[in-house]
């Protein structure tokens, strides 16, 4: 299983939110590039970077910082947050981003994500499915939608998008464990490359996700709060 240390960027700082609430924020560093190099040096094989300003404002506020991360590290970097135009995808890919994660725009227009996967390749486009219960949220998790998780994901899978980043918003940043029940339902869908996000509290959570056959898992707060170590991640992640 691929394990992605998370770097969430807000106003140029490395932060973590609780349940996606911008008012409930902990700062873990003021240099995202330095943080990326740290995780790489400790054995990370991938990085998951989020432009939180972009997620809330709808455009790529931290694009330059993300570009510098991609220039600094040698490992693949996936990026999400406020990516809602084809030009934004193109810019990230040209800046060295390995995989672009589309969220709110894909909920509003699944066709947008489907076309992006066709243009840039299925390995380089993912869709972020961020949910309150079984309902998909949008716009920095502030707004609800009429989309239900499983039918929405099935539509994407049937049309050429296979990498899905699933977040249970109620668990994100809470160290309460992932939503294993929903992970099981999603993992059962044919052809899915499922990445678990939100709630990882310890190495055993990662081991369980790996045993379930998931493609990947993202860990943020558990890593920053030393509930899980990079040594454990190196041991669990794909050899």
Where are these regions (language model features)?
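Conserved anion-binding
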Residues: 12, 19-23, 90, 97-172
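Glycine/small-residue-rich loop that forms an oxyanion/phosphate-binding "nest" at active or ligand-binding sites
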Residues: 53, 58-120
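Catalytic cores of alpha/beta
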Residues: 70-73, 77-99, 181-216
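Glycine-rich phosphate-binding active-site loops on the catalytic face of alpha/beta enzymes
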Residues: 83, 94-112, 168, 198-202, ...
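Charged helix-capping and loop-helix junction motifs
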Residues: 60-67, 142-151, 176-184
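Conserved, mostly hydrophobic/aromatic
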Residues: 8, 39, 47, 79, ...
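Glycine-rich, proline-tolerant flexible connector loops at the mouths of alpha/beta enzymes
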Residues: 46-64, 104, 165-176
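Structural preference for beta-strand elements that scaffold enzyme active sites
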Residues: 2-6, 46, 74-78, 98-101, ...
